[in-house]
Design a protein with these regions (language model features):
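Short, surface-exposed secondary-structure boundary micro-motifs
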Residues: 66, 119-120, 233, 566, ...
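Upstream accessory/linker segments immediately N-terminal to the RecA-like ATPase cores of bacterial MutS
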Residues: 73-264
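Inter-lobe coupling/hinge segments of SF2-like helicase ATPases
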Residues: 275-278, 289-607, 671
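Flexible hinge/switch segments at interdomain interfaces of large molecular machines
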Residues: 247-256, 446-449, 584, 632-637
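Accessory helical-bundle/CTD segments and flexible terminal tails appended to RecA-like ATPase motors
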Residues: 513, 532-542, 549-556, 561-564, ...
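OB-fold nucleic-acid-binding modules
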Residues: 37-68
Length: 698
């Protein structure tokens, strides 16, 4: 039996009680699990300072000396402050405790030799350490002359006396028991080529490094291994998918494409649009099913690229569909596509929940007869009665609004799965895209059409609302429209709904000469769409809303976006909301209104928004500030967010190298059966068998 698979209960010092807590709180069930529960930080314990060397700006330091005496000071009727005067023979400091007096007197004795560890501060002209860590100098230090590891613990663990120090002792005991080298999980050729330390060295040094260099090498090796297997799993899945699912071969672009390009397209495509169309064209004639993610900021021209993709399908005798997450966005796509195709005799139909009865039957019959060439819809397209004669291309707008299972249901609409183009206006950082959409090829439209004025973003405090209202009035009198957004409403945040309702009432008093619409997530769909339509048509001048307007609403006449309490929104969400304006020829503005009291992180978010309109810069910053698990849509992917040591936001370079190595393996062994790589495939099976998230990719 592999020693790493032993039950954690049988590690000396654990037993059945602590075993239950470790299982429940950390998911640690075996020795191997504990070995892979990595420290979150380290403190250098290799140096002992003299008291006269201490400075007030030092972080954690350690000193050695003796307790000279104790003193007590009354803080209140029930509370005492205990002070131990501590000397190393050349200076004196105070060790201070604000609670636990009995424990202090019982544990620490005058005249004994101790090593004290903590953060020095100055009080009353003298250095002091509040609630320091203290060890007898005569006892062997766990981390003597090295880096001390610190582990995350929970309240339940602390109740059972499982502190970071206790975990450190458990790991030390375990490593002493593991006398054989820990088995390698990477082939020698990768370890040597990438100058990695062995797995045995990495796992021992990540818990007990002698110095910062040793710690860094250990962590780099373990991060690489983790990200390598994530990428190997994703690329194996993609390779398997390509072998199993052949795609329709579209050998020509066809007359519809040529007529549209030469007769209906009134402007030049950007260089980025041309590049992406070529990438899509190459996919469609390759004989494999296209699975491509198209990223582009708001207004970059993704819908036009999607339309040209669908026209290629039509030119080869197939049908196409485009699915949007909301009815109003589907209606906008329908109107845009009809306008683009005016005079080309291509039948385009709309299918949403609002298309009912006789009209719905007409659309469905024409679809299966092949008369409808392009279908625009919502998730209604996925319903069983919807049948195409020959579906060749499916475009999915705002992928994170559709579950993976829904995407798969599209494949059942024809004899072969259609080519899939996934579009998103939510920029995804490259490292995250490698993980979430690792099975998709990625295209990026990274330039806006010429002449588009960037939105000007301005930060205002809530005390400046009077001048803000004057600016809104001026814009509306110039013929523009305005969004005013309140924070997202959830069932647990009743006050936000009240704020929106109160805000709406107040705005009606402030702007009696203008018409105001109101939209939020608690409204019935029909009521919400009716209010939205009033704003889209220009019947109302102000739209008071929550973030239900975040995706896809296109009102070129709207030139002002006011986001109240914007400190409560993430960067990507703020950027998406800002994307609702700046769609016309006029200068547009995004006003971020906050309270005066802002955390450092919030101030940074606001500053980034005011500095740049680049969605990819914003997405990278958002990933670093919030982490991948918080980003919208990532939880649906089920991929790789159970990382134990790697950080997708900060380990992009390691991720890229890991993907390169994984791709080499897949290229050399696409069927994953070669005995040369048996070690890798065995390890990958182990990871998928023990990790729910890994299994989800497969």
């Amino acid at each position: 039996m592999n020693i790493l698979s032993q039950d954690i209960m049988y590690l000396p010092g654990v037993g059945p009680n602590k075993k239950d807590v470790l299982n429940k709180e950390l998911g640690v069930r075996t020795w191997g699990d504990l070995l892979e529960y990595y420290p979150y930080k380290y403190v250098d314990r290799s140096r002992i300072y003299a008291i006269h060397e201490l400075q007030s700006d030092m972080p954690f330091v350690q000193i050695r000396g003796r307790i000279l005496s104790f003193e007590e000071f009354e803080m209140s009727a029930r509370k005492k402050r205990v002070v131990a005067h501590f000397s190393d023979g050349r200076g004196v400091v105070d060790l201070v405790w604000f609670s636990g007096a009995q424990y202090v007197y019982k544990t620490y004795k005058v005249g004994e030799d101790y090593i004290v560890f903590g953060r020095p501060t100055v009080y009353g002209g003298r250095f002091q350490f509040s609630h320091p860590e203290i060890e007898r100098a005569s006892e062997l230090q766990l981390s003597e002359m090295g880096m001390q590891p610190y582990y995350v613990t929970t309240e339940q663990m602390k109740k059972r006396n499982i502190s970071s120090r206790a975990l450190e002792k458990m790991v030390k005991t375990m490593l002493q028991k593991i006398t054989e080298p820990i088995p390698e999980t990477l082939p020698d050729f990768i370890v040597n080529a990438r100058h990695l330390v062995s797995r045995d060295t990495a796992l021992r040094c990540v818990h007990y490094p002698k110095n910062a260099i040793e710690m860094q090498k250990a962590r780099e090796r373990l991060k690489f291994e983790e990200l390598f297997y994530v990428q190997l799993n994703i690329l194996r899945y993609a390779s398997d998918h390509r072998r199993k699912f052949r795609g329709y071969v579209f050998s020509q672009v066809g007359d519809d494409f040529h007529r549209f390009y030469s007769e209906n397209l009134k402007f030049e495509l950007t260089g980025a649009q041309k590049r992406v169309v070529h990438e899509i064209r190459d996919d469609m004639r390759s004989g494999r099913q296209m699975n491509r993610l198209l990223q582009g900021d708001v207004g970059s021209g993704k819908t036009l690229v999607a339309l040209m993709t669908m026209l290629i399908a039509l030119g080869n005798g197939y049908q196409a569909c485009i699915m949007a997450p909301t009815e109003i966005l589907a209606e906008q796509h329908f109107a845009t596509i009809q306008e683009f195709l005016r005079g080309l005799n291509i039948r385009v139909e709309l299918l949403t929940g609002q298309v009912k009865g006789k009209r719905r039957h007409e659309v469905l019959d024409a679809l299966i007869a092949g008369e409808v060439k392009i279908l625009v819809g919502t998730h209604a397209v996925l319903e069983d009665p919807v049948r195409f004669q020959r579906l060749g291309v499916a475009v999915i707008d705002e992928q994170h609004r559709f579950g993976v299972a829904q995407r798969a249901r599209l494949w059942a609409k024809g004899e072969n799965p259609p080519h899939i183009l996934v579009m998103t206006a939510t920029p995804i950082p490259r490292t995250l895209a490698m993980t979430i959409y690792g099975d998709l090829d990625v295209s990026i439209i990274d330039e806006l059409p010429p002449g588009r004025k960037p939105v000007q973003t301005i930060h205002k405090y809530d005390s400046q609302m009077t001048s803000l209202y004057a600016g809104i009035r001026q814009q509306i009198r110039l013929g523009r429209q305005v969004y005013i957004v309140y924070p997202l409403i959830t069932e647990s945040e009743k006050s936000d709904l009240k704020n929106l309702e109160e805000g709406y009432a107040a705005l009606c008093d402030i702007f009696p000469e203008f018409k105001i619409s109101k939209v939020h997530g608690k409204m019935k769909s029909k009521e919400k769409d009716a209010e939205m339509q009033k704003f889209v048509s220009g019947e109302t001048q102000i739209l008071v809303a929550t973030t239900v307007i975040e995706v896809g609403v296109n009102v070129p006449n709207a030139s002002v976006m006011v986001i109240l309490d914007s400190q409560r929104f993430g960067l990507s969400q703020l950027h998406q909301l800002r994307g609702r304006v700046g769609r016309g020829a006029d200068q547009s503005y995004c006003i971020l209104v906050t309270t005066y009291k802002l955390s450092a992180e919030t101030s940074k978010r606001i500053d980034i928004m005011c500095e740049t309109n680049d969605g990819f810069r914003i997405a990278e910053a958002d990933l670093k500030l919030r982490g991948p698990g918080d980003l919208e849509g990532t939880q649906q992917s089920g991929i790789a967010f159970d990382l134990k040591i790697a950080d997708i936001a900060r380990d992009g370079q390691i991720m890229t190298i890991a993907r390169e190595e994984a791709q080499k393996i897949i290229d050399a062994d696409p069927t994953c059966t070669s005995s040369e790589y048996a070690l890798l495939w065995r390890r990958l099976r182990e990871l998928r068998d023990t990790n729910v998230n890994w299994a989800a990719i497969s």
